[in-house]
Design a protein with these regions (language model features):
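GST-like domain detector, emphasizing the conserved glutathione-binding G-site
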Residues: 1-114
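C-terminal active-site "lid" helix and adjoining low-complexity regulatory extension at the edge
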Residues: 197-210
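Non-transmembrane alpha-helical segments in soluble domains
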Residues: 50, 54, 72-75, 147-150, ...
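GST-like fold's C-terminal all-alpha helical module
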Residues: 80-199
């Protein structure tokens, strides 16, 4: 969203090992992302943040739709299904979980000890407690789950390039955000052979002002 509309902002990294210290104590600030306006206004969770930014800084153009029911249906679908599919592909096996936590520790601004604690203590928690149960509950391998979701989503475009038609709308950017969250990790290679999904993903990337 921010890169798509070219909005200047300050990005603050949060070390998950120190989240309680780095995030304010308000109950709603228990996880990232959090958007804080210059006047102190706070918005939490990805989709509400994107709606807020679009309305305040982009004239609400990404939220505008000729079919509100279709937009609302697929926005809920993305938040429900794509969001839950990120954990299984990143942490669905012990090896995947280790690769992910190791990669996170290298990407983020952790201290020497925090990097190693997160990489080696984090992966059994994410795999054993969270991801494994989601994979078991769904029954599909993470790659198949993502391919099925990408097929379902891109089929909804009809003959258009984007869900929003000739240009991306908020639903496109929400779905793109979930898929992009996997891109820094080796597991993203499991998605690159989905032709329609990658064509849409690259088309969204081309709109980013970076």
């Amino acid at each position: 969203m921010l890169e798509h509309i070219g909005l200047e902002h300050e990005k603050v990294q949060v070390n998950p090992m120190k989240a309680k210290k780095q995030l304010p104590s308000a109950p709603e600030w228990t996880k990232v992302p959090v958007w804080v306006e210059a006047d102190g206004e706070i918005i939490t969770d990805s989709t509400p943040i994107m709606k807020h930014i679009d309305a305040k800084y982009n004239g609400g153009s990404l939220w505008n739709s000729e079919d509100d029911a279709r937009r609302d249906k697929w926005l809920e679908w993305a938040d429900l299904h794509m969001s839950k599919a990120t954990i299984p592909i990143l942490y669905g096996s012990m090896f995947s979980a280790l690769k992910t936590t190791t990669r996170v520790s290298k990407l983020e601004k952790f201290g020497f000890i925090s990097k190693r604690l997160y990489a080696w203590a984090g992966f059994p928690i994410m795999w054993g407690i969270i991801a494994r149960s989601r994979v078991k509950k769904d029954g599909r391998k993470p790659k198949q789950l993502w391919h099925d979701l990408l097929s379902e989503f891109t089929d909804s475009f009809g003959d258009a390039e984007f869900f929003g038609g000739k240009s991306p709308d908020l639903v496109d950017l929400v779905a793109f955000g979930y898929m992009r969250s996997i891109s820094p990790y080796p597991q993203f290679s499991q998605l690159t052979d989905h032709e329609a999904g990658m064509a849409w993903y690259r088309a969204i990337e081309a709109t980013l002002k970076v």
